[in-house]
């Protein structure tokens, strides 16, 4: 769980197929908090328990756990998607006991989700690159709704007379296209990312991924060759 949380952020859930159930594990005590079984049990209205009910304390050896039958997977995954908050790592099993192998089958997030769309609104994941030179912003914007394939690309620049013009144009784009997930990339630490998010009124937005480096063009060339 810690690995995936490092990659995808604090609102990451692991759903693991164990026998005929999907289960969520975690630890929530005075010393450490790992995972969100208590939070998810409340949202899904399912029972929260411990691996060994006879032991009151929960820890890595006796974790908290909550789960639901595999037959009800679509129902509960749709409910979690409705929160528009979580990146959900789905771990499935194959083989027969005792030779069970578990693997990552899918990763769902508010902006990368095709099979469990809950309404007919646009559902964009947007990537933004922000550069600043002499307090003048240059911004690149790309957004895609993976459920429809609808895509937008845009580049804008501020001016000496209006140094926040690019941010204002970006604000308009984000408001025009329903943004479920946002990736903000800047060059280095010199740009205050939180200040930008606050300006765009995304300061409290749950699904924001921050990057202080940009992937080189060679990565794009290799990916699409």
Question: Could you tell me what each predicted segment is?
Answer:
Residues 1-225:
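Basic, polar low-complexity surface loops/patches
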């Amino acid at each position: 769980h810690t690995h995936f949380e490092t990659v995808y952020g604090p609102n990451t859930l692991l759903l693991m197929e164990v026998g005929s159930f999907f289960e969520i594990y975690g630890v929530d005590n005075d010393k450490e908090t790992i995972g969100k079984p208590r939070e998810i049990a409340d949202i899904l209205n399912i029972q929260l328990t411990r691996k060994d009910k006879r032991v009151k304390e929960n820890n890595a050896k006796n974790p908290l756990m909550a789960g639901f039958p595999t037959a009800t997977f679509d129902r509960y995954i749709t409910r979690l998607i409705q929160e528009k908050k979580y990146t959900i790592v789905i771990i499935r099993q194959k083989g027969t006991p005792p030779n069970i192998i578990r693997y990552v089958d899918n990763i769902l997030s508010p902006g990368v989700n095709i099979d469990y769309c809950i309404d007919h609104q646009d559902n964009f994941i947007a990537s933004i690159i922000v550069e600043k030179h002499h307090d003048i912003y240059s911004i690149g914007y790309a957004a895609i709704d993976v459920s429809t394939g609808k895509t937008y690309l845009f580049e804008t620049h501020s001016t000496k007379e209006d140094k926040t013009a690019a941010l204002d144009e970006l604000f308009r784009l984000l408001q025009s296209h329903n943004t479920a997930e946002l990736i903000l990339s800047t060059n280095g630490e010199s740009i205050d990312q939180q200040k930008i998010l606050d300006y765009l009124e995304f300061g409290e937005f749950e699904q924001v991924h921050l990057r202080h480096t940009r992937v080189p063009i060679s990565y794009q060339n290799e990916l699409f060759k």
